């Protein structure tokens, strides 16, 4: 009977078969993205606040990888007799094979396609492995170049430090499982690198992720050994870029003694998927955020486009078509629209005459958002589980069973699982971007946005093209996302004497997904910026409509009191103001004064018909009709003045930094975070004054404001706000 054993931290269970060999089981993750996102955030925050990441080979989470890689969270090894015993048994197998002159791949044989060579000089063999893998291209100097480069010499040739730190952590977690035959001392030395914040300078390119990420990991091994030709990042980052120095110098500065690797340990470090898994983990840590933010943006888009909450009704999704991702997206958006005064809460039945000319339902980018986002959520969850399992696996060859003494020659370094996870993630990022692009394109289009001005211009559109640059920019972003969505794994080439005839290209795929992540972050930032502008415009519209109604009522009485005093004026007023509201929606491309002339003129036929039908004499009808031009003129002048005054109040801050807050429900914290915390104001101040003070004096550029949102997404500040929506 199998014996079930719970790990102390409760994350993971494993089974021991009759011979005591541990059988790995996947760490349980929530089945929905929202629960995972919240759990991931809370875990990351705990690590950022000082909780130690304890490495045991079985419970490493994506949040822990992100915390150690990006926030320098403390890392320790679980120092248990069980772990040490497992390591010692596997190491003893290697020692016994060497002492018995047994042929073991990578210990007494050559590597890959050269595995037909033999040697008893195991240490020289290990050095030969590192020597040929130290073949990556890196800048030879950090001095100023005589010619301006086309790309940054460091960034274009070497990996970011976070990728390398994550890879070291994941490799530690693989080695401590006791299947690679390395010593505890080696694993502890790798932890020392993380604790001292010594990060090897690793080439960006050169791995096909077949026999693992051989070349990148060779630079980690070289650092541990104190190879003077291997350079590292060292020193504090508080006063500028970190220094790039020799590994020997860095180890000496931190009182770390270089380690002399023993037989199989060179290969044990190199033969794994740690870099692929590291980049994939860091990608997915942020992908969950963007996937949740896409649902938040869709809720916000539904509000500003005066859309239907019923698009996301449980009957459509949970009852009629219960795909789990679709159901989750609909439920999330539905909940976010709770309390909104902009989104329509219930579809009321109307007659054919009542909604003549009106769009009967929202367009696809809103109405089918759950169906579009749902499959992406499912693929992202699948990728999360795959990469988490990869981080808690032994990716090496050969593998040592310390219990039986058997050595298994296999291919656990083949990272195709990571490749597939990244391919589907990258495609999902494109689809998310496509949806947000479609929503934003609808938002800035005056024929589609239900009465908002073109390009969301808050002032006269003849000299305000506010969102046009963003409209173009997001088209560039989504186009690049489409290009990046192409699979990488279809470009696999045979390598290394045709031994690695199939390989995964997992690291290349993960790198491409990092690029997609960045581009989608830019697109999402741009859309959020426009959504906040649209919120303010809706609030301004509501104030203006109220003011217009008061003006119309006053002017009806002022110009036609003698003709309507004996009649119920309510039906007339309702018809007149309704016609003007409708004309407002059709004249958004016009400047204030001519627009209000046209809006006031929308009442003409209604008033003519009313007075012709309700006057007792021709003289009274003529008198009423004679007053019409003055009524229209006065309404137009007062309405234009009211609109300009409201624009000034909103743009100059009289209504506060977040004037639309009262209209929002659960999306309000996002809007207020952007408006209040980040300090991004409603756009249009310079246009209001017709650029009298020039450009850049009264406000920063549009791009600078979008950049603030992008930085908040990138550094995690926005993540906390999004989590708070669901607390």
Curated annotation (Swiss-Prot):
Biotechnological and industrial applications of this entry: The structure of strobilurin A was used for the development of the major class of beta-methoxyacrylate agricultural fungicides since its beta-methoxyacrylate toxophore targets the Qo site of complex III of the mitochondrial electron transport chain and prevents adenosine triphosphate synthesis. Compounds such as azoxystrobin (Syngenta) and Kresoxim methyl (BASF) are among the most widely used fungicides worldwide. This class of antifungals are used as effective treatments against a broad range of destructive fungal plant pathogens and make significant contributions to food security.
Binding-site list for (E)-cinnamate: 271, 361, 367, 397, 468, 496, 499
Gene Ontology biological-process entries: L-phenylalanine catabolic process
Crosslinked residue numbers (5-imidazolinone (Ala-Gly)): 210-212
The keyword Lyase is annotated on this UniProt entry: yes
This protein's GO CC annotations: cytoplasm
PTM description: Contains an active site 4-methylidene-imidazol-5-one (MIO), which is formed autocatalytically by cyclization and dehydration of residues Ala-Ser-Gly.
Catalytic reaction annotation: L-phenylalanine = (E)-cinnamate + NH4(+)
Active site: 105 (proton donor/acceptor)
GO molecular function: phenylalanine ammonia-lyase activity
One Pfam family per UniProt: Lyase_aromatic
2,3-didehydroalanine (Ser), modified sites: 211
UniProt-listed Enzyme Commission number(s): 4.3.1.24
Superkingdom of source: Eukaryota
Keywords attached to this entry: Lyase, Phenylalanine catabolism
Keyword Lyase among UniProt keywords: yes
InterPro entries xrefs: Aromatic_Lyase (IPR001106), Fumarase/histidase_N (IPR024083), L-Aspartase-like (IPR008948), Phe/His_NH3-lyase_AS (IPR022313), Phe_NH3-lyase (IPR005922), Phe_NH3-lyase_shielding_dom_sf (IPR023144)
Primary role: Phenylalanine ammonia-lyase; part of the gene cluster that mediates the biosynthesis of strobilurin A, an antifungal polyketide that contains a key beta-methoxyacrylate toxophore that targets the complex III of the mitochondrial electron transport chain. Strobilurin biosynthesis begins with construction of benzoyl CoA by step-wise elimination of ammonia from phenylalanine by the phenylalanine ammonia-lyase str11, oxygenation by str8 and retro-Claisen reaction to form benzoic acid, which is activated to its CoA thiolester benzoyl CoA by the dedicated CoA ligase str10.
Family: Belongs to the PAL/histidase family.
PANTHER family referenced in this protein's UniProt entry, alphabetically: HISTIDINE AMMONIA-LYASE (PTHR10362)
Entry-linked NCBIfam families: phe_am_lyase (TIGR01226)
Name of protein: Phenylalanine ammonia-lyase str11
Organism per entry: Strobilurus tenacellus
UniProt lineage: Eukaryota, Fungi, Dikarya, Basidiomycota, Agaricomycotina
């Amino acid at each position: 009977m199998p014996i079930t054993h719970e790990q102390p931290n409760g994350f993971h269970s494993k089974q021991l078969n009759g011979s005591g060999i541990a059988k790995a089981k996947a760490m349980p993750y929530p089945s929905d993205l929202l629960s995972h996102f919240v759990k991931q955030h809370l875990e990351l925050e705990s690590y950022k606040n000082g909780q130690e990441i304890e490495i045991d080979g079985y419970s490493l989470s994506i949040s822990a990888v992100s915390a150690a890689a990006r926030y320098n969270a403390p890392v320790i090894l679980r120092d248990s007799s069980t772990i040490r015993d497992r390591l010692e048994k596997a190491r003893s197998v290697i020692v016994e094979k060497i002492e018995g002159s047994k042929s073991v791949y990578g210990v007494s044989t050559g590597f890959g396609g050269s595995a037909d060579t033999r040697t008893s000089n195991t240490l020289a063999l290990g050095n030969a492995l590192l020597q040929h893998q130290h073949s990556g291209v890196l800048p030879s100097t950090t001095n100023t170049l005589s010619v301006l480069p086309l790309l940054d010499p460091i960034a274009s040739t070497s990996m970011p430090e976070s990728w390398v730190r994550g890879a070291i952590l994941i490799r530690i977690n693989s080695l401590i499982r006791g299947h690679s035959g390395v010593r505890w001392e080696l694993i502890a030395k790798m932890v020392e690198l993380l604790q001292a914040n010594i990060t090897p300078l690793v080439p960006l390119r050169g791995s096909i992720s077949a026999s693992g990420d051989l070349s990148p990991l060779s630079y980690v091994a070289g650092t541990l050994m104190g190879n003077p030709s291997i350079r590292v990042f060292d020193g504090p980052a508080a006063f500028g870029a970190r220094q790039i120095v020799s590994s020997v110098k860095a180890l000496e500065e931190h009182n770390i003694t270089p380690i002399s690797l023993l037989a199989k340990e060179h290969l044990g470090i190199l033969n794994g998927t740690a870099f692929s898994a590291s980049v994939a983990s860091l990608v997915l840590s942020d992908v969950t955020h963007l996937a949740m933010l896409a649902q938040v943006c869709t809720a916000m888009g539904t509000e500003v486009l005066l859309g239907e909450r019923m698009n996301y009704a449980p009957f459509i999704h949970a009852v009629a078509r219960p795909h789990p991702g679709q159901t989750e997206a609909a439920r999330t958006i539905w909940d976010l629209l709770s309390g909104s005064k902009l989104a329509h809460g219930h579809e009321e039945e109307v007659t054919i005459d009542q909604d003549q000319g009106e769009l009967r339902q929202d367009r696809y980018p809103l109405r089918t958002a759950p169906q579009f986002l749902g499959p992406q959520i499912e693929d992202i969850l699948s990728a999360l589980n795959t990469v988490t399992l990869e981080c808690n696996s032994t990716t090496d060859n050969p593998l040592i069973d310390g219990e039986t003494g058997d050595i298994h020659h296999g291919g656990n370094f083949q990272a195709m699982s990571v490749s597939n996870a990244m391919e589907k993630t990258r495609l999902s990022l494109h689809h998310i971007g496509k949806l947000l692009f479609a929503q934003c394109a609808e938002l800035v289009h005056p024929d589609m946005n239900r009465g908002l001005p073109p390009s969301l211009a808050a002032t006269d559109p003849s000299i305000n093209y506010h969102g046009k640059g963003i409209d173009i920019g997001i088209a560039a972003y989504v186009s690049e996302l489409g290009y990046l969505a192409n699979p990488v794994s279809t470009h696999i080439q045979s390598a290394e004497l045709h031994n690695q005839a199939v390989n995964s290209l997992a690291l290349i795929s993960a790198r491409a997904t990092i690029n997609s992540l960045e581009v989608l972050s830019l697109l999402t930032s741009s859309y959020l910026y426009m959504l906040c502008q649209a919120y303010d415009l809706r609030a301004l519209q509501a104030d203006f409509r109220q003011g217009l109604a008061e003006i119309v009522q006053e002017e009806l009485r002022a110009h036609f009191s003698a003709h309507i005093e004996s009649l119920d004026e309510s039906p007339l007023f309702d018809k007149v103001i309704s016609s003007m509201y409708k004309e407002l929606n059709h004249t958004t491309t016009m400047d204030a004064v001519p627009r209000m002339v046209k809006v006031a003129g929308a009442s003409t036929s209604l008033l003519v018909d009313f007075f012709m039908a309700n006057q007792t004499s021709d003289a009274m009808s003529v008198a009423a009709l004679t007053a019409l031009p003055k009524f229209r003129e006065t309404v137009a002048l007062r309405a234009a003045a009211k609109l300009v005054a409201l624009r000034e109040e909103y743009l100059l801050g009289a209504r506060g930094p977040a004037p639309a807050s009262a209209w929002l429900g659960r999306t309000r914290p996002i809007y207020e975070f952007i408006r209040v915390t980040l300090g991004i104001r409603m756009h249009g101040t310079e246009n209001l004054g017709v650029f009298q003070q020039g450009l850049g004096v009264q406000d920063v550029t549009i791009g600078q404001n979008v950049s603030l949102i992008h930085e908040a997404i990138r550094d995690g500040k926005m993540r906390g706000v999004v989590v708070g929506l669901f607390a």
